């Protein structure tokens, strides 16, 4: 299993890029090969996912570990294959996608190729509440218009702002904040995961 490759980007096509490392050219399928255009002719680090079938072994490439993580999560959804998962994250911005999943916005999800209403609902069913690992590092937090975070620890405040950005209401958050406040010394990620578990009970 490969984790990443470092080498020169020698070729860019509409479907894949070629990275040369150790005098071997690796064909790597990416969601948006042209996002690597600025790196053509220079060294790049590409995070990899190796997909094995009876008749084919393919390498899928990503510019961040967050993209790869989301890709693997999408593959776990019934009806989503590698090409569909890649098309979903091809924009390179995972925040709107995660927000749509957490807020159950199936209309947004059906905008992606090969994602119909049924598949969109399946994505929400399988992944809602399971993407907290990506949330904290990817979402840009905005100061809230209410005092919901007043008096909270910096870690819990960051978690609450992340959940607000994902579409959870003040009413929903006020129900779980007292329970979260009882847990000391948790990271933002840990608070987010705990809050999602409490709100889905």
Swiss-Prot record:
One CC-aspect GO term: cytoplasm
InterPro entries linked: DNA_helicase_Holl-junc_RuvA_I (IPR013849), Hlx-hairpin-Hlx_DNA-bd_motif (IPR003583), NA-bd_OB-fold (IPR012340), RuvA (IPR000085), RuvA_2-like (IPR010994), RuvA_C (IPR011114), RuvA_C_sf (IPR036267)
Endpoints of the signal sequence: none
Annotated localization: Cytoplasm
Region (Domain II), start-end ranges: 64-142
Family membership: Belongs to the RuvA family.
Protein name listed in UniProt: Holliday junction branch migration complex subunit RuvA
Species in which this protein is naturally found: Listeria welshimeri serovar 6b (strain ATCC 35897 / DSM 20650 / CCUG 15529 / CIP 8149 / NCTC 11857 / SLCC 5334 / V8)
Lineage summary: Bacteria, Bacillati, Bacillota, Bacilli, Bacillales
């Amino acid at each position: 299993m490969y984790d990443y490759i470092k080498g020169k980007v020698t070729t860019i096509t509409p479907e894949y890029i070629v990275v040369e490392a150790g005098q071997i050219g690796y064909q790597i399928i990416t969601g948006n090969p042209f996002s690597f255009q600025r790196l053509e002719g220079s060294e790049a680090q590409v995070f990899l996912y190796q997909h094995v079938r009876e008749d084919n072994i393919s390498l899928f490439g990503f510019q961040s570990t967050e993209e790869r993580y989301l890709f693997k999560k999408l593959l776990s959804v019934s009806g989503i294959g590698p090409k569909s998962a890649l098309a979903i994250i091809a924009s390179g911005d995972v925040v709107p996608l995660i927000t749509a999943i957490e807020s159950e916005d199936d209309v947004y999800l059906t905008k992606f190729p090969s994602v119909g209403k049924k598949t969109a609902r399946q994505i929400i069913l399988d992944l809602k509440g399971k993407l907290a690992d990506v949330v904290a590092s990817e979402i840009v937090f905005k100061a809230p218009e209410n005092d919901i975070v007043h008096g909270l620890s910096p870690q819990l405040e960051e978690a609450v702002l992340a959940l607000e950005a994902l579409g959870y209401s003040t009413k929903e958050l006020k129900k779980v904040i007292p329970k979260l406040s009882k847990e000391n010394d948790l990271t933002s990620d840990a608070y987010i995961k705990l809050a999602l578990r409490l709100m889905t009970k």
